[in-house]
């Protein structure tokens, strides 16, 4: 009999007598008969599906626990993926062999690259997604993933045991307790609870306990986390009403067609499943003063707006927009929900007014005069955990082998959740096999920026990814996510397939070869002008001009360059992606050199590790103010670089910490050298004894 300390109670269990509480849907014929897994993932949303499949790809026997299997892959809010900053996350998730990008390519009904007026480093790939197709394709993928078992069930509590002495944390998670009292054991547990922790839905003055419309919240688990000592906050979000397509007058609205050709999210796909000519348009309309009037006259009927709980700054409700920006017109994008769906999603009209007032407001808008509301908009309020309580691997400081991913960490958006899910799944698996964590730094990816911001700065409002948050965005582009992460994912995490790894290696070597060839081809400027007349090349240049420099001109691409110099450039035009990436590399060549130097400087700071067991409150070897000590104690940064980004930690404190780290490293090196010398002398003594 083994005993585990639960939240304020003792949980007793015998490993030999455990019975599995419910029949499970398994894609793994080798799933254990006893309920013991390597990794348990709680929640089947966008973070949970990525976490579960990532852990399984890494070789861990994984259990995905969800309230309902038929809601796996459900897009609870907007029917779209990607956007500015978010599209970068999608490419990075795909580079680590995640699911959502490939599923989007199979399910998209309208593809558009945003930010085209700017450089390719900040282009944002976005797609409208068929909700029904996405859910079907995701469930098919999940239920056919080796080593992954899916089970319906709600988690009420965590099973805890004594901590591992070599790691920080006051206890260790070793399983979960379901609402029916049954238990399942695991080496690592990942919480991806979304908006379900003590979630409530708000419409007007009415509130209902729910994580989303039609699904029950998670109460017991929220209480467990609070009793364990986690700092819990409260956030809110919302979704707009759904409108009947047939009731909208599209003929008077501004029509927006998809890009042709469509750019896929996944590096493994050359095209998307639904051809551009078969894709659906979106339409644009605007609010007007009558909308403002309805909002302002009925604030007393809207408890969600009156709440002090913080909502998403960059996806506000229409009520928030009217209050913050009075007398302005606001865009409303009418987005299709699927190829055969009768519903339209009015992006920009998230609201929590009473249902009858929602329809009254909508019919004030141009093109929606006869619109019928099929489902009212509603708000959701839910618990989240201060993300400064987790490490860059997404493991919690308080409880060993417990990982958080998704909205539980204070983020908003499918893409942010998916990115965290992949990292949590990888690291939960690596923790089981006692391997070093897989951490993406700020210099390596948008995922690194996302996690670093959360773990060092925390958040008091739903966090959304933007390109403006990234210091090295010229290097961290959507086109090169595979070069940055796929090779690492294969070698350091084991989460990338052999086929994807080989493709990334081929692309990397082809790019290096292509750039080398382009640098080697040189002609006079006048000759280049004759070869490519459309290029605005100045003929007054006296020095030879490289083909790589010619490719920098906006009018020139690899096709026109290959026509001018067929050999050896023609072969680089056969792969469209390779040709486009060579163009991008040429565009940024001069600035990338300087940015790489800056990255090296940052990496040096990141390489200076702070001792994991450092007690900032009592340490005497470093001069720190009481305020700085408290901030460092709460956030527990792992590197000097991370410590420098914590608000309130002064440059003087960083210098003192830097001195402390270097002194500690010198002492450790001296001790290691002394130990080697002692070992050498001992070996010499033994050798002499044998000779005698």
Curated annotation (Swiss-Prot):
Q: Which UniProt keywords apply?
A: FAD, Flavoprotein, Methylation, Mitochondrion, Transit peptide, tRNA processing
Record GO biological process = mitochondrial tRNA wobble uridine modification; tRNA methylation
- Which cofactors does it use? FAD
Name the principal localization, coarsely classed: mitochondrion
Q: Where does FAD bind?
A: 43-48, 155, 218, 407
SUPFAM superfamilies the UniProt entry points to: FAD/NAD(P)-binding domain (SSF51905)
From the UniProt record, list the reaction(s) this protein catalyses: 5,10-methylenetetrahydrofolate + uridine(34) in tRNA + taurine + GTP + A + H2O = 5-taurinomethyluridine(34) in tRNA + 7,8-dihydrofolate + GDP + AH2 + phosphate + H(+)
Q: Which residues carry this modification: N6-methyllysine?
A: 508
Q: Pull one GO CC term from this UniProt entry.
A: cytosol
Transit peptide feature range: 1-25
Q: Which InterPro entries match?
A: FAD/NAD-bd_sf (IPR036188), GIDA_C_N (IPR049312), MnmG (IPR004416), MnmG-rel (IPR002218), MnmG-rel_CS (IPR020595), MnmG_C (IPR026904), MnmG_C_subdom (IPR047001), MnmG_C_subdom_sf (IPR044920)
Protein location: Mitochondrion
SMART domains documented for this protein: GIDA_assoc_3
GO MF terms, alphabetically ordered = flavin adenine dinucleotide binding; tRNA 5-taurinomethyluridine synthase activity
Q: Which family does it belong to?
A: Belongs to the MnmG family.
Q: What function does this protein fulfil?
A: Component of the GTPBP3-MTO1 complex that catalyzes the 5-taurinomethyluridine (taum(5)U) modification at the 34th wobble position (U34) of mitochondrial tRNAs (mt-tRNAs), which plays a role in mt-tRNA decoding and mitochondrial translation. Taum(5)U formation on mammalian mt-tRNA requires the presence of both GTPBP3-mediated GTPase activity and MTO1 catalytic activity.
Assembly description:
Homodimer; forms a dimer in the presence of potassium. Interacts with GTPBP3; forms the GTPBP3-MTO1 complex composed of homodimers of GTPBP3 and MTO1.
- Name the chain's protein: 5-taurinomethyluridine-[tRNA] synthase subunit MTO1, mitochondrial
Source organism per entry reads Pongo abelii
